[in-house]
Amino acid sequence: MQDNRFFILMILLVFSTSLNQGQKLKANDRRSAGLVPYPRIGRNSEISSFSRSERALGLIHQPRIGRSDVSSFDNLNRFHDLSSDADIEFYAMDMDPLLSPDYEDYASKPIALKYADKLQKDNSWLMPDHIHGYKDFHFAQKINDPRLYYSILRDSRNTQGQGGYTPRLGRENERDTANFL
């Protein structure tokens, strides 16, 4: 009975694929999953007939601050037709009323120092303390004492043979590797 069910299932699959015209799937289809060549839901055919405007809206052809090459500004409107002057009138406003006389008076005073102006201008903050001088003279003597310097060097070496314990961090040679395996 099991063989009959399997045989009937195979016949149904073959029959259903023949009804579907047996469309062959391409194995090398490079399109990403989910991307289809037709418009998304909610897009109508009017968008495809929508023509783009030749004029860039909202862009104003004025030189940027700090650019002084006059030859590059000869034909600013060569590619775009600025038929509407409303944009230019909106953005080209007089800046004089925006500046308050109080600010101009304050900026011209020499008393108006910023915090950065009060900082040291030389590179003395990069120098170590012993060049400028120590606040504690005994501390300076300890640092400059050669006996202290050599004792620090002697203590920094591996003291495993002198009773100190240093854990082994890894295999030191090939013999240790062979013994480990």
Swiss-Prot record:
GO cellular component, one term: extracellular region
Keyword Secreted: yes
Post-translational events: A pyrokinin potentially constituted by residues Asn-158 to Gly-170 has so far not been detected and might be completely absent in ants.
Residues annotated as signal peptide: 1-22
Proregion span(s): 23-29, 44-54, 68-181
Superkingdom of this protein's organism: Eukaryota
Biased composition (Basic and acidic residues): 169-181
Sites bearing Isoleucine amide, chain numbering: I41, I65
Tissues expressing this chain: Periviscerokinin 1 and 2 are expressed in central brain, antennal lobes and gnathal, thoracic and abominal ganglia. Periviscerokinin 2 is also expressed in the retrocerebral complex (at protein level).
UniProt-recorded name of the protein: CAPA peptides
Organism this protein belongs to: Camponotus floridanus (Florida carpenter ant)
